[in-house]
Amino acid sequence: MNLDALQQRLGYRFSKPELLQQALTHRSHSAQHNERLEFLGDSVLNCAVADMLYGMFGKLDEGDLSRVRANLVKQQALYEIAQMLQLSDTLRLGEGELKSGGFRRPSILADALEAIVGAVFLDAGFDAARALIRKLYIPILEQVDPRTLGKDAKTLLQEYLQGHKIALPQYNVIATHGAAHSQQFEVECTVPKLEVRVFGTGASRRAAEQAAAKLALDEVQKLVPQLLKRSRAERTGKTRKQPQPQDPQLSLRLKE
């Protein structure tokens, strides 16, 4: 298997190419598979990402750092990076996995990426693995807000309203549809002060509330800047209309 193109995309060339080949080998293909490398890579990845976040975001507390890290190393994030690296083109899968589309499966691709991190660690040590992880993650971190990454819509809406001293939203289930085993909930979310009223649906009350909160947040983020602008304009207008106090010395001089 020619892995030159993948090594170029990784920005790292293995001194022991067999480690990379093993990292790309699923257990359905061979007994010499990537699961041990995946175990190792998972730990290296968590440590390197924690180190990177600690250095980049000095104002985030422990809870926020943990939240951001969890979102960066979860399966979906690893899957998206694996797609960017085109790992599906280089995976070694058994015949059954190939036929079932295993090369597209998020779990298999995410595991392979962790195994590659483990392989780099064995090939050249922690510094090399950390350099690879930084190369993969820095472009992602430049496009996200660490203060909001991983927070759900209800939390974001609540924090936004609290930040502008607006009363919290109200959620009410207004309808349920379908049979008991496949119900759909419809939830109303209102922000009375801003006259926002939206509706969300979902397979559970929580999912419906999240859907409604997302719509409400979109509306609130449009309205609040307009209200702030209007409020500033009104304050400026009142200031301009106030009469200037008369200088008493000037008044005396005029009388003379």
From Swiss-Prot:
PROSITE patterns: DS_RBD, RNASE_3_1, RNASE_3_2. It catalyses: Endonucleolytic cleavage to 5'-phosphomonoester. Its EC number is 3.1.26.3. InterPro entries: dsRBD_dom, RNase_III, RNase_III_dom, RNase_III_sf. Mg(2+) binds at E38, D111, E114. GO terms for cellular component: cytoplasm. Residues 3-125 form the RNase III domain. Its cofactor is Mg(2+). It is found in: Cytoplasm. Residues 152-222 form the DRBM domain. The keyword Hydrolase applies. GO terms for biological process: mRNA processing; regulation of gene expression; rRNA processing; tRNA processing. Pfam families: dsrm (PF00035), Ribonucleas_3_3 (PF14622). HAMAP family: RNase_III (MF_00104). Digests double-stranded RNA. Involved in the processing of primary rRNA transcript to yield the immediate precursors to the large and small rRNAs (23S and 16S). Processes some mRNAs, and tRNAs when they are encoded in the rRNA operon. Processes pre-crRNA and tracrRNA of type II CRISPR loci if present in the organism. This is Ribonuclease 3. It comes from Cupriavidus taiwanensis (strain DSM 17343 / BCRC 17206 / CCUG 44338 / CIP 107171 / LMG 19424 / R1).
